């Protein structure tokens, strides 16, 4: 009789059950201490970089976010990749023509850290219109991890969101909505250089407050009121409530600016003007200068 093996594997990714021990105060205190060790320099554009500008970082960050969204990466991948990028730029001068290679490499490493099935080098090269080769990406990977001293388990705002939600006496339905909106705010903050100066815990807390404010959620015990929630989260992360409010206001201003920019991009007149400009300037199909990247 022919023996056959029965394969019981499924395509869905297996996930661990939530562990309450990982959400206790001792773990949160350790995370608040650890976030200081993986913070990038807030002045690397002035002190380290000679060619790369904040506007170039914005372009590459937006491209990285779109790649992560299209590939349905885990929510943690993009903020972690941006942490790698900012820390590398804090240490090493980078030519503007190599910034997209660095961004792809950061996604490559972050995907390995956070995903069961990580992004491949070949797939990331395709997203650059094959302007880089897999061999270049692997070489940059070695340089990246060495410059970061293999300290790759950096804290990101996503790591704190679950801790905050676990301490909020709210219904699970509300928590799911808040979590989704807060994750969107975290990704948006990662694209803006102004938030480098804020620790991940503050970005996470500000995102949760902004999510609750934007959703206009109400609770029977009034826990979700603006001032009460702000005071509560400021005590959790041990910061001044005014600093947390300032961060939350920055997040809301960034959202408003992004929505305004999206509306302008959808304006037919603006699109026609952009097409006329593209006709006047003959650009290469694969931009070698990051400022020429058309997101």
UniProtKB/Swiss-Prot annotation:
Cellular-component GO terms for this entry: bicellular tight junction; cyclin D1-CDK4 complex; cyclin D1-CDK6 complex; cyclin-dependent protein kinase holoenzyme complex; cytoplasm; cytosol; microtubule organizing center; nuclear membrane
Subcellular location field: Nucleus; Cytoplasm; Nucleus membrane
Keywords per UniProt: Cell cycle, Cell division, Chromosomal rearrangement, Cyclin, Cytoplasm, DNA damage, Isopeptide bond, Membrane, Nucleus, Phosphoprotein, Proto-oncogene, Repressor, Transcription, Transcription regulation, Ubl conjugation
Segments for region (Disordered): 262-295
Listed CDD domains: CYCLIN_CCND1_rpt1 (cd20573), CYCLIN_CCND1_rpt2 (cd20576)
Glycyl lysine isopeptide (Lys-Gly) (interchain with G-Cter in ubiquitin) crosslink, residue number(s): 269
Phosphothreonine: residues bearing it: 286
Location (main, coarse): nucleus
Biological processes per GO annotation: cell division; DNA damage response; endoplasmic reticulum unfolded protein response; fat cell differentiation; G1/S transition of mitotic cell cycle; lactation; Leydig cell differentiation; liver regeneration
MF-aspect GO terms: cyclin-dependent protein serine/threonine kinase activator activity; cyclin-dependent protein serine/threonine kinase regulator activity; enzyme binding; histone deacetylase binding; proline-rich region binding; protein kinase activity; protein kinase binding; protein serine/threonine kinase activator activity
Superkingdom classification of source: Eukaryota
Residue ranges occupied by any Cyclin N-terminal domain in the UniProt entry: 28-152
Feature: compositional bias, Acidic residues: 272-282
SMART domains (UniProt xref): CYCLIN, Cyclin_C
Post-translational modification remark: Phosphorylation at Thr-286 by MAP kinases is required for ubiquitination and degradation by the DCX(AMBRA1) complex. It also plays an essential role for recognition by the FBXO31 component of SCF (SKP1-cullin-F-box) protein ligase complex following DNA damage. Ubiquitinated at Lys-269 by the DCX(AMBRA1) complex during the transition from G1 to S cell phase, leading to its degradation: ubiquitination is dependent on Thr-286 phosphorylation. The DCX(AMBRA1) complex represents the major regulator of CCND1 stability during the G1/S transition. Also ubiquitinated by the SCF(FBXO4) and Cul7-RING(FBXW8) ubiquitin-protein ligase complexes. Following DNA damage it is ubiquitinated by the SCF(FBXO31) protein ligase complex. SCF(FBXO31) ubiquitination is dependent on Thr-286 phosphorylation.
Involvement in disorder: A chromosomal aberration involving CCND1 may be a cause of B-lymphocytic malignancy, particularly mantle-cell lymphoma (MCL). Translocation t(11;14)(q13;q32) with immunoglobulin gene regions. Activation of CCND1 may be oncogenic by directly altering progression through the cell cycle.
Protein name: G1/S-specific cyclin-D1
Protein's organism: Homo sapiens (Human)
Gene name as annotated: CCND1
């Amino acid at each position: 009789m022919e023996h056959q093996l029965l394969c019981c594997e499924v395509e869905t990714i297996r996930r661990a059950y939530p562990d309450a021990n990982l959400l206790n105060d001792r773990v949160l205190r350790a995370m608040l201490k650890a976030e200081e060790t993986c913070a990038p320099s807030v002045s690397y554009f002035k002190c380290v970089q000679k060619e790369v500008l904040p506007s170039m970082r914005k372009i590459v960050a937006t491209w990285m976010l779109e790649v992560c969204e299209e590939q349905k990466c885990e929510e943690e991948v993009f903020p972690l990749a941006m942490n790698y990028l900012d820390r590398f730029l804090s240490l090493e001068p980078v030519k503007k023509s190599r910034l997209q290679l660095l961004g792809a490499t950061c996604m490559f490493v972050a995907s390995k850290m956070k995903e069961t099935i990580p992004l491949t080098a070949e797939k990331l090269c395709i997203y650059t219109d094959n302007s880089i080769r897999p061999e270049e990406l692997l070489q940059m990977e070695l340089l990246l991890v060495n410059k970061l001293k293999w300290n790759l388990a950096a804290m990101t705002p996503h790591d704190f969101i679950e801790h905050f939600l676990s301490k909020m006496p709210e219904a699970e339905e509300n928590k799911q909505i808040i979590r989704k909106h807060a994750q969107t705010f975290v990704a948006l903050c990662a694209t803006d250089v102004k938030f480098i100066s804020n620790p991940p815990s503050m970005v996470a807390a500000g995102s949760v407050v902004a999510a609750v404010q934007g959703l206009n959620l109400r609770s029977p015990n009034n826990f979700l009121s603006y001032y009460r929630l702000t005071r509560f989260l400021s005590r959790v992360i041990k910061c001044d409530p005014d600093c947390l409010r300032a961060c939350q206001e920055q997040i809301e201003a960034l959202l408003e600016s992004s929505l305004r920019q999206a509306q302008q991009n959808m304006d037919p007149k603006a699109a026609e003007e952009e097409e006329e400009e593209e006709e006047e300037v003959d650009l290469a199909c694969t931009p070698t200068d990051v400022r020429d990247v058309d997101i």
